[in-house]
Swiss-Prot record:
Region named Domain I: 1-63
Region called Domain III, residue ranges: 153-201
InterPro entries: DNA_helicase_Holl-junc_RuvA_I, Hlx-hairpin-Hlx_DNA-bd_motif, NA-bd_OB-fold, RuvA, RuvA_2-like, RuvA_C, RuvA_C_sf
Residue numbers spanned by region Domain II: 64-142
Cystine pairs: none
Organism expressing this protein natively: Listeria welshimeri serovar 6b (strain ATCC 35897 / DSM 20650 / CCUG 15529 / CIP 8149 / NCTC 11857 / SLCC 5334 / V8)
Stored NCBIfam families: ruvA
Identification of the protein by name: Holliday junction branch migration complex subunit RuvA
Region entry Flexible linker, spans: 143-153
Function summary: The RuvA-RuvB-RuvC complex processes Holliday junction (HJ) DNA during genetic recombination and DNA repair, while the RuvA-RuvB complex plays an important role in the rescue of blocked DNA replication forks via replication fork reversal (RFR). RuvA specifically binds to HJ cruciform DNA, conferring on it an open structure. The RuvB hexamer acts as an ATP-dependent pump, pulling dsDNA into and through the RuvAB complex. HJ branch migration allows RuvC to scan DNA until it finds its consensus sequence, where it cleaves and resolves the cruciform DNA.
Keyword DNA damage: yes
Homology family: Belongs to the RuvA family.
Superkingdom: Bacteria
Length: 201
């Protein structure tokens, strides 16, 4: 299993890029090969996912570990294959996608190729509440218009702002904040995961 490759980007096509490392050219399928255009002719680090079938072994490439993580999560959804998962994250911005999943916005999800209403609902069913690992590092937090975070620890405040950005209401958050406040010394990620578990009970 490969984790990443470092080498020169020698070729860019509409479907894949070629990275040369150790005098071997690796064909790597990416969601948006042209996002690597600025790196053509220079060294790049590409995070990899190796997909094995009876008749084919393919390498899928990503510019961040967050993209790869989301890709693997999408593959776990019934009806989503590698090409569909890649098309979903091809924009390179995972925040709107995660927000749509957490807020159950199936209309947004059906905008992606090969994602119909049924598949969109399946994505929400399988992944809602399971993407907290990506949330904290990817979402840009905005100061809230209410005092919901007043008096909270910096870690819990960051978690609450992340959940607000994902579409959870003040009413929903006020129900779980007292329970979260009882847990000391948790990271933002840990608070987010705990809050999602409490709100889905």
């Amino acid at each position: 299993m490969y984790d990443y490759i470092k080498g020169k980007v020698t070729t860019i096509t509409p479907e894949y890029i070629v990275v040369e490392a150790g005098q071997i050219g690796y064909q790597i399928i990416t969601g948006n090969p042209f996002s690597f255009q600025r790196l053509e002719g220079s060294e790049a680090q590409v995070f990899l996912y190796q997909h094995v079938r009876e008749d084919n072994i393919s390498l899928f490439g990503f510019q961040s570990t967050e993209e790869r993580y989301l890709f693997k999560k999408l593959l776990s959804v019934s009806g989503i294959g590698p090409k569909s998962a890649l098309a979903i994250i091809a924009s390179g911005d995972v925040v709107p996608l995660i927000t749509a999943i957490e807020s159950e916005d199936d209309v947004y999800l059906t905008k992606f190729p090969s994602v119909g209403k049924k598949t969109a609902r399946q994505i929400i069913l399988d992944l809602k509440g399971k993407l907290a690992d990506v949330v904290a590092s990817e979402i840009v937090f905005k100061a809230p218009e209410n005092d919901i975070v007043h008096g909270l620890s910096p870690q819990l405040e960051e978690a609450v702002l992340a959940l607000e950005a994902l579409g959870y209401s003040t009413k929903e958050l006020k129900k779980v904040i007292p329970k979260l406040s009882k847990e000391n010394d948790l990271t933002s990620d840990a608070y987010i995961k705990l809050a999602l578990r409490l709100m889905t009970k």
